[in-house]
Amino acid sequence: MAEKSKILIIGGTGYIGKFVVEASAKAGHPTFVLVRESTVSDPAKGKIVESFNNSGVTILYGDLYDHESLVKAIKQVDVVISTVGQMQLADQTKIIAAIKEAGNIKRFFPSEFGMDVDKVNAVEPAKSTFAIKVQIRRAIEAEGIPYTYVSSNCFAGYFLPTLVQPGATDPPRDKVIISGDGNAKAVFNEEHDIGTYTIKAVDDPRTLNKTLYIKPPKNTLSFNELVAIWEKLIGKTLEKIYIPEEQILKDIATSPIPINIILAINHSTFVKGDQTNFVIEPSFGVEASELYPDVKYTTVEEYLSHFA
């Protein structure tokens, strides 16, 4: 069997980054994480770095904004996975420049882990947020860097514990607010599964220069179907309040940052159905649960059962 690629994760202490690092180490890849020295002294992040150390991950000190340290780190690996957060998406041009200079990278995974930004029809301000990811994609392609874009749609941990109810900390037990008519389908993926599928794609020729869509059939659901699963789990029918699209668009226009961004992303997802309103063609994409049927992914029903 071929040797497993050495992987560098940039942004590994972030929300989805932790799961990617864990999956990489678990799969037996020599795993490296780029961290700033200041990160280690941060109480919460320091604990994460410590857990990486304990699982055999190599910590490399460096910074997205320090070109030398970036090139030095990249030269030690075969694959770079970026999981940087929203504020640093545009600065991934610095990673692209370092990859070009290093000249040894077999594949780059930019920070995606959401909707396929080439397929969305979002309104502002989500439109501008997605546009940054589009610019990074085009920059990677223009430089001829081999890539995989991971479209993992909705993080279960963001959406399912509250069933996307505004301002809620628990799932609804009496009434539920539904965007639009509740028929547009979205996809909900548990974060460990996102990490697992991402790492499986690293050395897979089938995912090279393609988008890897994580769209398991049991987790591809309309909001009405999602509510029906929850109702079954709690043995109760909820009162349903449907918010028409024109009201949602008004709310987006009048809400402050970051509420307006969240509302606009939810509009794209749950009203427009931007995660599911296209067919995955072999020319540009592959679907994770089809490629890796051995992965026992967490279903939405299993996930929600912990809250029932």
Curated annotation (Swiss-Prot):
The pathway entry for this protein reads as: Aromatic compound metabolism; phenylpropanoid biosynthesis
Query: What reaction is this protein's catalytic activity?
Result: eugenol + a carboxylate + NADP(+) = a coniferyl ester + NADPH; eugenol + acetate + NADP(+) = (E)-coniferyl acetate + NADPH
The record's EC number reads 1.1.1.318
Matching Gene3D superfamilies: NAD(P)-binding Rossmann-like Domain, UDP-galactose 4-epimerase, domain 1
Q: Which UniProt keywords apply?
A: NADP, Nucleotide-binding, Oxidoreductase, Phenylpropanoid metabolism
In its UniProt entry, the species of origin is given as: Petunia hybrida (Petunia)
Molecular functions (GO terms):
nucleotide binding; oxidoreductase activity
Instruction: Provide the GO biological process annotations.
Output: phenylpropanoid biosynthetic process
User: Per its UniProt record, what InterPro entries does this chain match?
Assistant: NAD(P)-bd_dom_sf, NmrA-like, NmrA-type/Isoflavone_red_sf, PCBER-like
Principal EC category:
oxidoreductase
The protein depicted here goes by the name Eugenol synthase 1
Enumerate the residues binding NADP(+).
13-16, 35-45, 86-88, 111-113, 133, 153-155
Q: What does this protein do?
A: Involved in the biosynthesis of the floral volatile eugenol. Catalyzes the synthesis of the phenylpropene eugenol from coniferyl acetate. Phenylpropenes are produced by plants as defense compounds with antimicrobial and antianimal properties, or as floral attractants of pollinators.
Which residues are annotated as site, described as Confers substrate specificity?
Answer: 86, 89
Q: Outcome of altering residue 86 to V?
A: Confers some isoeugenol synthase activity
Q: Which parts of the sequence are marked as the site Required for activity? A: 265
Q: Which domain of life is it from?
A: Eukaryota
Q: What induces it?
A: Triggered by EOBI in flowers.
| Active-site residues, as the UniProt record annotates them | 133 (proton donor/acceptor)
Q: Which family does it belong to?
A: Belongs to the NmrA-type oxidoreductase family.
Q: What tissue specificity does the UniProt entry give?
A: In flowers, mostly expressed in limbs, and, to a lower extent, in tubes.
